[in-house]
Design a protein with these regions (language model features):
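Positively charged n-region of N-terminal signal peptides that target proteins for export
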Residues: 1-4
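N-terminal signal peptide c-region/cleavage motif recognized by signal peptidases
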Residues: 15-17
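Flexible coil/turn and secondary-structure edge motifs
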Residues: 20-145
Length: 145
C-alpha cells in the first residue's frame, strides 16, 4: 500500500506531463465572459478562466468586487502562440480608446488592463500598445499596464 500512492502519482505525471512551455497572462477588457470566449478561439490557448484582480478585497464575487477589474487568466503554450499574437487579438476585441469601461459595461471594473509578471511581459505589453496605436493612428493613453 505504501508504494501504491507514489505509483499513482508517477503514472499521472507520465500520462499528463507538465507543459514546461505553459505561460500565463492576466488581461482585463470589459466583460470577462466576452474576452474569455474570443481568446479561447486562438490556437495555442490551453484555457481561459474568468475572475477578478487588481483590488484589495479578499475573495471578490460577481456581486461584490469593488476595486477589482473583471479579468481573464490566459494559459497558453508558448510553442504554439506568442504573447504579441495574444495581445493583438486582445486589442481587436476591446475598445482601446475607452479607459472608463468597454462598450455597455462601464466603470473601473471594466477598464482595459494588461497585468504583467516580469520585464519581458511589460515590454511586450508596451510594444503591443504602440503597435495598436500606430495601426489606429491615435495615441492609446487609456490602456493600463
Amino acid at each position: 500500500m505504501k508504494y501504491f500512492l507514489p505509483l499513482i502519482i508517477a503514472l499521472s505525471i507520465f500520462i499528463h506531463p507538465v507543459n514546461v512551455f505553459a505561460e500565463e497572462l492576466i488581461l482585463a477588457g470589459g466583460c470577462f465572459w466576452c474576452l474569455e470566449h474570443d481568446l479561447e478561439s486562438l490556437k495555442g490557448i490551453n484555457f481561459v478562466q474568468s475572475g477578478y484582480s487588481g483590488g484589495d478585497l479578499q475573495n471578490p464575487t460577481y456581486e461584490n468586487h469593488e476595486g477589482h477589474q473583471e479579468v481573464v487568466l490566459v494559459d497558453y503554450d508558448s510553442r504554439l502562440v506568442t504573447l504579441p499574437k495574444i495581445l493583438r487579438l486582445y486589442f481587436r476585441n476591446i475598445d482601446p480608446l475607452d479607459g472608463k469601461g468597454q462598450f455597455c459595461d462601464r466603470g473601473d471594473s471594466y477598464k482595459p488592463v494588461i497585468f504583467f509578471k516580469d520585464k519581458t511581459e511589460e515590454s511586450d505589453a508596451k510594444n503591443a500598445i504602440f503597435a495598436a496605436s500606430n495601426e489606429l493612428r491615435v495615441p492609446l493613453e487609456k490602456i493600463y499596464v
